[in-house]
Amino acid sequence: MNQLHDAVDSTNLPLGPPIRGKVRDCYRLPGGRHGDAMLIVSTDRISAFDWILPTLIPDKGRVLTAISAFWFDLFSRGSDPVPHHLITTDVDDMDLPAGIDRGPLRGRTMLVRRAEVIPFECVVRGWLAGSALAEYRASGTVCGEPLPAGLVAGGRLPAPIFTPATKAASGHDENVSYAVMAERIGDARAAVLRGQSIDVYSRGAAHAAGRGIVVADTKFEWGRMADGSVILVDEVLTPDSSRFWPAATAGSGRVPDSFDKQFVRDWLEASGWDKSSPPPELPADVVAKTRDKYLDACRLLTGSLPAGVA
């Protein structure tokens, strides 16, 4: 575990080479009492514009894990539970080899069922912002689908829309039409993913609204199990995967400030960085404010901060 000033940059557990994403280090754990499982460790790395930034955000990995675990639990309840991959976030209940220091893993680690990830980001938008706003202003469409005239920046859409993107292992995810997605994975599977994604978004947005947060948009990932069933995987409704706005300022005719990494994107845009060369270090005040935004999102959505975080 590589830690810099209490922030975790990367992990090197004796579990074989990890699969490193932009934020997470993943290890396969086959053959334990939980079956074919994966260990997902959320580091404090942050990415923007398809680059991993050189600066860490302390406690970010704990926030992502706490929020995802909250949603997985919430969506498991009721008469229509959402199947998902999370087994536990309790490191003492994980079948790890003797000698592994579990301390640095606490609060930032999920043990999950292994699934074949379907290679599309399932994006759901309820409000107009980001690349959707730019496309709408240019053509009146989002991902090629026409929208009513007269929508404003940061405005609510008539209904949530599904706008998939190709999922890249590294590099740039590309927005595609629903028709392209259906052609690649089949009409039936595409329809299931669209319906389930909009349903989970709507349920999450309703909970967030009761906590004073608007979920402007988010992205989900789904995985296929050996029996053909589809389950919710990766992270869910976090500040990395979503735009969270204060409800009090949403719908004012401009895109509000947010509880997510848009603050970092905005700073990078204003810094003069060309997005084709390695990104600059984030200043200390940007790091501190970003951390505060993530903690605020966690506190508002879940009612508490991650264990051990003040």
PLM-predicted stretches and their roles:
Residues 185-216:
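A long amphipathic alpha-helix within ATP-dependent nucleotide-binding catalytic cores
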Residues 236-297:
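C-terminal helix-cap and adjacent tail motif
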